[in-house]
Amino acid sequence: MNNDDVIWHTINHSFCSFVVKTKTGRFCRNDDNVTGLCNRHSCPLANSQYATIKERDGIIYLFVKEPERIPYPGKQWERIKLRRNKDQALKQIKEHLLYWDKWIISRVKQRFFRTREYLKNMRRLALSRQKKLEPINRTVEKRELRREAKALRVARIERTVEQELLERLRASTSSKEIYNIDQSAFEKALEAEEINEESDEEYEEDEEEIVYTSGSDVEDIEDIGVIDEESEEEEAEHNLVLTNPKKKRKVTIHYEKDE
């Protein structure tokens, strides 16, 4: 009995920290296991001649263990870097496992294809756009909803007050009757009304009225204008007389004395 058989007998019938037993079978958690199953051919501890595939930082390596390096645990595994080209990598596997068992060669190739496939998927997912999920605090969300509803109610009330003020201003309602309202809304409505009135006055000043009359009407208008001018002059003279009354002259009487 060689050493591999002794190791397997101990692992199989005693205890192994890598074995996982289920209802359907037994599995191995050792990273060097080429198949992931717990059996005589797949066990990396009970086989002095063994090979597997591993991935490190996106690069695929072939790890080979041979009986000559078993006494040296630090040099037990030989690491061989495989090329990115699939055909060249398969050629490397055949060269290093030239006289090995066909079963281990086929399992190494299958593991190589699986590793190469999931590396492709990783690169594709890294380049694709992914959704980022963020947790939501329900308490904060409810508080924000309440604030939004309150802000909408306040805005609706301000709009109603502004409309009421505009209606009262149009109806010439006294501002003294308005109590307990927002003063800014009242001032805003009042400014809007003043701007509208100023624009209307400017528009009326710019307009020119044209009136068509007959010849007799023109003469009558001229006579009326002359009469108005004369009456204005008389009123001005009368005002001057009233405002500046002439002072009475003083009269002194001298009597002659008889000698």
Curated annotation (Swiss-Prot):
Location of region: Nucleolar localization/retention signal: 97-150
Compositionally biased region (Acidic residues)? 195-210
**Is this entry keyworded Membrane?**
no
Q: Which InterPro entries match?
A: Mak16, Ribosomal_eL28/Mak16
Residues annotated with Phosphoserine modification: S199, S231
Keyword annotations for this protein, in alphabetical order, are:
Nucleus, Phosphoprotein, Ribosome biogenesis
- Could you tell me the Gene Ontology terms of the biological process aspect for this record? maturation of 5.8S rRNA; maturation of LSU-rRNA
Q: Which GO terms describe its cellular component?
A: nucleolus; preribosome, large subunit precursor
> Pfam families, per this entry?
Mak16, Ribosomal_L28e
- Cell location: Nucleus, Nucleolus
**What is the residue range of the motif Nuclear localization signal?**
245-251
Q: Which Gene3D superfamilies is this protein grouped with?
A: 3.30.390.110
Q: Where is this region: Disordered?
A: 195-215
Note the PANTHER family from the entry.
MAINTENANCE OF KILLER 16 MAK16 PROTEIN-RELATED, PROTEIN MAK16 HOMOLOG
Family to which the UniProt record says this protein belongs: Belongs to the MAK16 family.
What function does the entry list?
Involved in biogenesis of the 60S ribosomal subunit.
Entry protein name: Protein MAK16 homolog
**Organism name:** Schistosoma mansoni
